[in-house]
């Protein structure tokens, strides 16, 4: 067959090349590109890394690209490219905040004839081999991305080309339309007629070029309250959303930065790429930490060393004065950690942004103040060189609603507004001082992320000392005490200064080791830093282990305190009880609608929610570390049976009708919502229409505990751990203790009785949900079904009162519904609670 194809192929090739030659002969000779200088002589020129030319007559922005990356003038140098959002949407749910930045990408320009392409090479897959063939294999095995294509409009004798980049700069590089669609707000598309280059944000400098565009996104369909609620919350015309997007081209940092290997014990974010030429037996994945560049002026210095270029951060001038001061002070704490790592005072600096500086200039490390419609997270991010992990720009986003939520929490705890007493000044306002404590800590926390640090959610398990911070990289719950006369004290809610763990982490990431006058890596010295820390009892556990509801680690939690989560839960419940006894009109200011008492009540009524979550994780818990072979750390250990039972006893107190029933003296103060102040998702649930619902509130609080306690993963572990050691509590032990603690079969009267029955109903629903959960093991489901059968027999007995009879009838009906067809049973959803996280902030 191959032989018979040869004449045919020869004919095809001959015809093909003949056709190509004929086409070439008939084509017009290509005209040389116009002179760049001539083409731009009437335009406004912005010299810089990539020069810009603005044509005011046509509204077009031209980009000059020097093709100096090769001798043929077909390739540019490599640049770092990033995008950001100088004007955001102010919606926490959509997540497009003012000042938001992307990650940095490596890019370059390539010319082919009249085309210029902007290309992002694939930096995720690399080789350290110097062999051209090995490098070609990697390059050809994975795709690159062409980000944009341009037509060459003119060129200069030195190889620079001019392109019309207007369409590119007016494109949706920040993926705003994608974010809108992803949050269910509908389809939006850029309307070119209502979009333009924003000249006030477009600048060029020797080491970076900045271009900003004002973009209008037009709705492509209906934008009703039901279909686009978040857009309607924040936009004058929800069919037309106008924001600004910003693009930055940066010169790559010079040589001299030494990447530092990532360790799971050190508390950093990793940057990772694959090296396909490492020896067999070694990991393909090459992991390094992200960090700023710090180099000693004197390589021989070992203490209080002066940096060639200190790390400089700037705080947004738009924050209110008191907040600005707190932001600056908190971020400056990091200098303490750098001094521990061998650097001189002032190596880490924080100042107010100069009045004439542009916060979107990628050269500035920024702490920005951001407004949103509802509460949401603050966060720290960074633009880093993907080749090395070197941080080029740190960017902190701090939500302005943080302080207002913290102030609300302090008001609920302290009930500060005594009738006839004037409001205190700032220095004597306990709530305000608590807010400023928190803002300082928050500024330090988010700045820590921009230094490369991850969360350490186990820091709060270190012995508590009000005068000592363990880590600002934890999520702190306010440490509130109660005086001898029953008054909550918020004066020491948050400690001052950088933490013990934070100093360890900075020591690992930023201490410079030198040999022969040059920075080097010293693996034994880095390992010693971590070993010395581990000997003190410090633990590092981060998000993956702390956030899941089914998490097993007994020390890694969000918004908790104390070495013993169960003991601390008992203490927090006592603080809550003391504050509830004092709660009344004196928690709101004179002239405030009384219905706002309900808003102030929410964070106090649910004050225990996160400490309860911490205590729950001891049940079916496993204590472990991020072990590396040879590091000497402990091996995993199941939480001791006594500790699990202590935790269970404390957790079950959160289901107590006595804890969840509000007194009549308080209920009598709560009117229906005032016109203009409707309930929101921040309100406690109500099944009673306009009036406050104390039973619905209790159901909601109970479900917070029950969802955690009867999580399928936790239940499965209880089964496993009891099988491995019969001294460990079994799943049945936990179920029976829960039923006994709440008095499931007791018939009580009054509001306490209704709350008791409501909680009992939620317990049943939690058990039914676990029995029907496909992720629960067969043993877990079987254990729960045996319990349900036993409950059915007990519920069939007559009650002493009508309320009890009605409750039992409903419970029996639900159990019968389940057993009729377990595969088709639909568990009731948990009663929604107001969002809690973050403490004193958004989302």
Segments and roles (model prediction):
Residues 317, 321-329, 433-442, 595, ...:
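Soluble non-cytosolic domains of exported or imported proteins
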Residues 1-9:
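Bacterial N-terminal signal peptides that target proteins for export
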Residues 21-23:
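Boundary at the C-terminal end of the N-terminal hydrophobic targeting segment
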Residues 332-343, 448-449, 453, 478, ...:
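Sec-exported extracytoplasmic/periplasmic mature domains
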Residues 459-460, 467-843:
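Conserved catalytic/binding loops enriched for acidic/polar residues
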Residues 351-371, 437-491:
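The catalytic-center signature of Zn2+-dependent metalloproteases
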Residues 25-319, 337, 344, 352-405, ...:
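Auxiliary tRNA-acceptor-end handling modules of aminoacyl-tRNA synthetases
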Residues 8-19:
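Bacterial N-terminal signal peptides
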């Amino acid at each position: 067959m191959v032989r018979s194809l040869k004449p045919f192929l020869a004919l095809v090739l001959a015809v093909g090349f003949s056709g190509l030659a004929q086409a070439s002969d008939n084509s017009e000779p290509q005209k040389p590109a116009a002179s760049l200088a001539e083409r731009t002589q009437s335009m406004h020129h912005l010299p810089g890394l990539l020069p810009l030319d603005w044509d005011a007559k046509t509204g077009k922005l031209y980009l000059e690209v020097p093709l100096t990356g090769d001798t043929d003038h077909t390739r540019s140098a490599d640049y770092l490219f990033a995008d950001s959002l100088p004007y955001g949407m102010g919606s926490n749910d959509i997540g497009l905040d003012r000042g938001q930045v992307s990650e940095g990408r490596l890019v370059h320009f390539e010319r082919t004839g009249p085309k210029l392409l902007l290309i992002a090479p694939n930096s995720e897959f690399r080789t350290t081999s110097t062999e051209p063939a090995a490098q070609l294999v990697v390059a050809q095995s994975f795709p690159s991305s062409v980000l944009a294509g341009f037509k060459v409009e003119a060129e200069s004798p030195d190889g620079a080309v001019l392109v019309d980049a207007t369409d590119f700069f007016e494109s949706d590089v920040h993926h705003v339309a994608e974010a809108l669609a992803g949050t269910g707000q509908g389809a939006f598309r850029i309307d070119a007629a209502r979009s333009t280059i924003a000249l006030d944000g477009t600048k060029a400098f020797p080491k970076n070029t900045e271009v900003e565009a004002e973009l209008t996104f037009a709705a492509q369909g209906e934008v009703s309250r039901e279909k686009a609620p978040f857009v309607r919350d924040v936009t004058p015309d929800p069919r037309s959303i106008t924001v600004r997007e910003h693009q930055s081209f940066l010169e790559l940092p010079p040589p001299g930065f030494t990447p530092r290997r990532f360790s799971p014990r050190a508390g950093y974010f990793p940057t990772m790429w694959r090296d396909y030429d490492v020896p067999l037996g070694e990991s393909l994945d090459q992991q390094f930490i992200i960090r700023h560049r710090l180099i000693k002026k004197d390589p021989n210095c070992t203490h209080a060393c002066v940096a060639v270029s200190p790390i400089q951060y700037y705080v947004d001038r738009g924050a209110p004065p008191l907040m600005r001061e707190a932001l600056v002070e908190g971020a400056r704490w990091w200098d303490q950690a750098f001094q521990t790592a061998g650097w001189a005072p002032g190596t880490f600096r924080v100042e107010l942004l100069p009045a004439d500086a542009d916060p979107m200039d990628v050269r500035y490390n920024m702490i920005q103040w951001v407004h949103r419609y509802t509460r949401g997270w603050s966060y720290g991010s960074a633009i880093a060189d993907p080749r090395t992990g070197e941080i080029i720009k740190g960017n902190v986003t701090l939500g302005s609603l943080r302080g207002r939520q913290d102030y609300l929490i302090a008001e609920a705890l302290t009930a500060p507004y005594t009738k006839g007493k004037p409001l205190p000044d700032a220095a004597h306002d306990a709530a305000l001082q608590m807010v400023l404590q928190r803002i300082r800590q928050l500024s330090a926390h988010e700045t820590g992320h921009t230094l490369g640090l991850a969360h350490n959610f186990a820091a709060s398990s270190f012995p508590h000392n009000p005068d000592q911070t363990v880590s600002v990289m934890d999520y702190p719950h306010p440490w509130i005490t109660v005086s001898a006369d029953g008054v909550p004290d918020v004066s020491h809610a948050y400690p001052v200064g950088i933490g013990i763990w934070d100093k360890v982490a900075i020591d690992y990431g930023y201490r410079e080791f030198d040999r022969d006058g040059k920075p080097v890596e010293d693996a034994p010295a880095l390992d010693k830093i971590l070993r010395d820390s581990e000997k003190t009892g410090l633990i590092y556990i981060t998000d993956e282990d702390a956030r899941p509801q089914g998490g097993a680690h007994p020390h890694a939690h969000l918004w908790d305190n104390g070495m013993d989560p169960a003991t601390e839960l008992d203490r927090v419940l006592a603080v809550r009880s003391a504050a509830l006894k004092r709660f009344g009109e004196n928690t709101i200011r004179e002239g405030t609608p009384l219905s706002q008492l309900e808003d102030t009540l929410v964070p106090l009524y649910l004050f225990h929610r996160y400490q309860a979550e911490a205590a729950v994780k001891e049940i079916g818990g496993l204590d472990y570390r991020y072990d590396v072979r040879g590091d000497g750390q402990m091996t995993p250990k199941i939480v001791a049976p006594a500790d699990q039972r202590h935790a269970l006893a404390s957790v079950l107190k959160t289901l107590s009708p006595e804890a969840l029933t509000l007194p009549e003296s308080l209920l009598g103060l709560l009117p229906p919502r005032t016109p203009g102040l409707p309930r929101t998702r921040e309100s406690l649930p109500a099944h009673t229409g306009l009036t406050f619902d104390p039973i619905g509130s209790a159901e909601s609080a109970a479900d917070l505990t029950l969802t955690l306690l009867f999580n399928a993963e936790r239940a499965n572990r209880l089964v496993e751990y009891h099988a491995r050691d019969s001294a460990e509590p079994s799943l049945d032990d936990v179920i029976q203790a829960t039923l006994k603690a709440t008095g499931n079969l007791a018939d009580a009267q009054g509001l306490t009785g209704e709350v008791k029955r409501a909680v009992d109903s939620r317990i049943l629903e939690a058990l039914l949900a676990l029995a029907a959960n496909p992720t629960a093991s067969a043993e877990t489901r079987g254990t729960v079904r045996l319990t349900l059968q036993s409950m059915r027999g007990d519920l069939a007995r007559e009650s002493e009162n009508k309320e009890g009879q009605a409750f039992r009838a409903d419970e029996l009906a639900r159990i019968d519904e389940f057993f009729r067809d377990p595969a088709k049973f639909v568990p009731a959803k948990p009663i929604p609670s107001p969002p809690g996280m973050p403490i004193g902030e958004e989302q």
